[in-house]
Amino acid sequence: MEEMRHAGQISRKLLFYFGSDNYNLSINDSMFRNCTLRADRAAALFGTMLEGVFLGIVLTMMGFFSVKTRFTPSSNIWLFAGCVAIALWLMTKMAQDYAPGPLKCIVTENLALFCSLLGGALNVGMCVDRCRAVYSRMARGSMTPAAICTYIFWAVVGSLLVIAVNALEMSRNGLHMSEGLEGGCFQAASPLAHRAKLVAKFLMYLVFVCIVSVGTALTLVKILNTNLNRKRAICVNVVLVTLPNTFIWLTAMTSAWREFSSYKMCPKIVTGNVFIYLSSVPMLVILFVYMFTGKNLKHTLRPQTRSYSSSTGSASCFAHLAGKP
């Protein structure tokens, strides 16, 4: 009862003055003080147009993977699922600019979290698939389409469970419904929960980085121990595939650590900031890098795979991962 009364006081005391540089959070907690307002309302229209262009690119790629290639090779299933996650993320960010109502933050922030979790799981799955293929003695050592779809299904289920718990926590005391939060969303219902989520976010991305780093290192070791003539070029392409994801995760870890160390709990700017609209660029770069390196690997391996037996060498596995049916 005491906690509910305190939560109600927080909700009533939260004030926001338009035209100022800071949120005026009249709450007796140092974590709420000196929160800077960085929203630029003039950027919303530009951002929506930019996100519309990005969404068109992603939808075109989805059509290419599904209609043009018919998900052949099976690695295109990974890329199609990644496109779906990015498309949903873009539509979520567009909705954050215009969606009304007190539940906007609960719905859109958890959809964005879902896309982030699913995207990370997909990239980890692709890395494991790639590593598994190069260490297999079979010509088709990569995951089957059924196995990939099963992995994606459980990744979706796991991500949904996480955002369900997060949504319940965010909405438990009404802080998300405070007046005047246009342009910002609280990520938690209390300072303690906020710090716990930052730690969880840091650890989650750390796990992603560790799995992908180990998987990539094992893949590179295996490639370098083969008799392929252009194995160094293949290794460069494999590294290029993993670098964008690793950079994004390391950036997210740094951001979470800095926010945790600041002892602040400020509303997260979700609209009216040009950097938010440009944040989808790295994800598009990742997709193009996958497509480019796959094509590059295919041309690199084509003249070499004919001289290897599919039962004794891994060259066929490399070619399959590169996009060769």
Swiss-Prot record:
Keywords, in A-Z order: G-protein coupled receptor, Host membrane, Membrane, Receptor, Transducer, Transmembrane, Transmembrane helix
Record field: transmembrane: 45-65, 71-91, 106-126, 145-165, 198-218, 233-253, 274-294
Keyword Transmembrane listed: yes
Cross-referenced PROSITE patterns: G_PROTEIN_RECEP_F1_1
Localization: Host membrane
Keyword Transmembrane helix: yes
Gene3D superfamilies: Rhodopsin 7-helix transmembrane proteins
Membrane-topology annotation of the record: Multi-pass membrane protein
GO molecular function: G protein-coupled receptor activity
GO cellular component labels: host cell membrane; membrane
Family affiliation: Belongs to the G-protein coupled receptor 1 family.
Protein name as catalogued: G-protein coupled receptor E6
